[in-house]
Amino acid sequence: MRDIPFRHSFIAAWLMALLLCSGTPAPASTPAQTPTPGPAVPAARVLLHTAQGDMVLALDPVHAPVTTANFLHYVDQKRFDGAQFYRAVTIGDDGLYGLLQGGLYGTRLQPFKPIAHEAPAVTGLHHADGAVSMARGEPGTAQSEFFIDIGDMPEYDGNGDDPGYAVFGRVESGMDVVKQILAMPRAADAGGADFHGQMLAAPVKIISARRVVAPVKP
């Protein structure tokens, strides 16, 4: 299973990030120049129609062109029709933070070839609440598995030699559906030692995935 590791040091790292961000920044020696904005490029929107409800993903083809094109290839080839959300990780007792992972795992659908890794340090896209990112083993092995952040997850942006995970969009609408799935029961005997307690007892089917032109009204 292509997957993201869950480090026990996450909460400590997250709290440290908050502490570092709380300091007063040093004044810049020279004012930054404001670049002249170019023509607006619309986000590529995808409607995921799931057994638990709909969610709309706004993808970023400007900052993450490779990863966005890969995801849209699965959409256009209808390869996500019949995919599923199967892994739900919660952090803390309140269950307000975590991630939801989906893709072709556990189905008979076959993935396309792996893609090049687009690191957050290069794209400028970060693991904020609602971010959509690629699951992978080593960098350059991502194919069909993706995850959605519930809450800010700065650790997954990477640091130093860690290239992080490739963010390529965000949930534009349907975070309530994401949270409903996150709260669903877990399988007691699935996931092995690494993912015990993280696999959904009843994976949620992605019935269809289609491009949409404009934001979908709730």
What are these regions (language model features)?
Residues R2-D3, C21-P218:
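Cyclophilin-like peptidyl-prolyl cis-trans isomerases
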Residues D3-A12:
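Twin-arginine (Tat) signal peptide motif
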Residues I11-S22:
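Bacterial N-terminal signal peptides
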